[in-house]
C-alpha cells in the first residue's frame, strides 16, 4: 500500500495502480465514512492494507486533523462486502455510506446523509477551530 499525503488528506492507495471506469464510478462509486480520533483512524487504515492491495477495497483516505475521519472507497455492488471487512477490522463506531457523485442516491437515505455532513462539519471545527477551518479552506482552494 502506498501512502500519499497532502494538506488535507492522507491517501492509502494500492501498490499497483488499477484502471477505473469513470462512468461506472460516477454512477456507483461511494465510500464508507468512519469518524474517530486520529490515532485510531491511522491504526485502522493500516489494518486495511491487504484489502486495498488485493482490490477488495479500492482505496481510502483520512482527514489529517484530529479528530479525524476515514473514507473507504468501493463500488456500491461491493458495499456490504466492504462493510463486513470494516467490521472485522475493528470499525466499532457507526459508519455511514455515501455516494461520491451520485448525489440523488444519497438523498434516498436522508438521515445517513445528514449524519455524514454534520459529522464532517463537526470534525473540521473540532480539528481546527473556526478560524483555523477558514484558513484551511483558503489553503485548500489555492492547492487546486
What is each PLM-predicted segment?
Residues 1-144:
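Structured alpha/beta or helical-core interaction and ligand-binding surfaces enriched in interleaved
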Amino acid at each position: 500500500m502506498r501512502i500519499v499525503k497532502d494538506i488535507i488528506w492522507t491517501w492509502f492507495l494500492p501498490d499497483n495502480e488499477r484502471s477505473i471506469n469513470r462512468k461506472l464510478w460516477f454512477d456507483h462509486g461511494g465510500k464508507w465514512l468512519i469518524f474517530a480520533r486520529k490515532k485510531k483512524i491511522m491504526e485502522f487504515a493500516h489494518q486495511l492494507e491487504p484489502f486495498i492491495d488485493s482490490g477488495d477495497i479500492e482505496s481510502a483516505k483520512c482527514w489529517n486533523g484530529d479528530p479525524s475521519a476515514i473514507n473507504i472507497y468501493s463500488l456500491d455492488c461491493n458495499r456490504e462486502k466492504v462493510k463486513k471487512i470494516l467490521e472485522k477490522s475493528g470499525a466499532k463506531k457507526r459508519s455511514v455510506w455515501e455516494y461520491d457523485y451520485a448525489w440523488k442516491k444519497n438523498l434516498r437515505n436522508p438521515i445517513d446523509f445528514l449524519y455524514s455532513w454534520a459529522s464532517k462539519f463537526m470534525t473540521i471545527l473540532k480539528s481546527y477551530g473556526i478560524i483555523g477551518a477558514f484558513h484551511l479552506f483558503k489553503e485548500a482552494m489555492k492547492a487546486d
